[in-house]
Amino acid sequence: MRRIGIAALAAAALTYGANAQAQKKYGPQGVSDTEIKIGQTMPHSGPVSVYGIMGRVHMAYFQMVNERGGVNGRKVTLISADDAFSPPKTVEQTRKLVENDGVFMMFGSSSTAGQSAVQKYLNAKKVPQLMLSTGASKFNDPKNFPFTTPILQLYSTEGEVYAQYLMDTKPDAKVAILMQNDDFGRD
């Protein structure tokens, strides 16, 4: 039994060792034997800078992950770039993160309009655009955008739930809808 355990451990070490060597040479951008580099765009300044707190929470989370040994022994480095809630700035910062900083993926970025502006670019580059802080239906399209995944429920689903609640509990209620005139509001 002990020989089988030692043989299994040796086989696993050789397998993972070979994978680590291959990764040095052939691995994806932003991933090395010691680090996983990820990026995000957040409104750390501008009209909705209060949402920048999400980026700081993500930084704290990955700091905790790193203090506990990282991911498979790799340190996670999150670069949180300020897009000031401006789609042109989102495009600029995303390109910098991918092309200059060499991030493996984009994680937890916010702004429906900003993420709409970079969705095609990131999918064309095959850079994962994961856990987007938006519920716009355009980000739930794996056939056309396989590298994009939102974290929030779809806004249309949320609207249906609210409408059903009103119909069930206040059937005579008058409803007003306010929207902002951009991708977020139109969805």
Predicted regions and their residues:
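Short, low-complexity disordered leader/linker segments with a strong preference
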Residues: 1-36
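Hydrophobic alpha-helical segments typical of transmembrane helices
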Residues: 40, 61, 93, 135, ...
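Flexible, small-residue-rich helix->loop connector segments that border functional cores
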Residues: 61-71, 166
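Extracytoplasmic ligand/sensor domains, especially the bilobed periplasmic-binding protein
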Residues: 88, 102-187
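Residues at or immediately flanking beta-strands
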Residues: 35-37, 73-78, 174
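Extracytoplasmic "Venus flytrap"
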Residues: 26-59, 81-88, 110-111, 178-186
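Structural motif
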Residues: 75-100, 158-161
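Extracytoplasmic
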Residues: 33-35, 53, 73, 85, ...
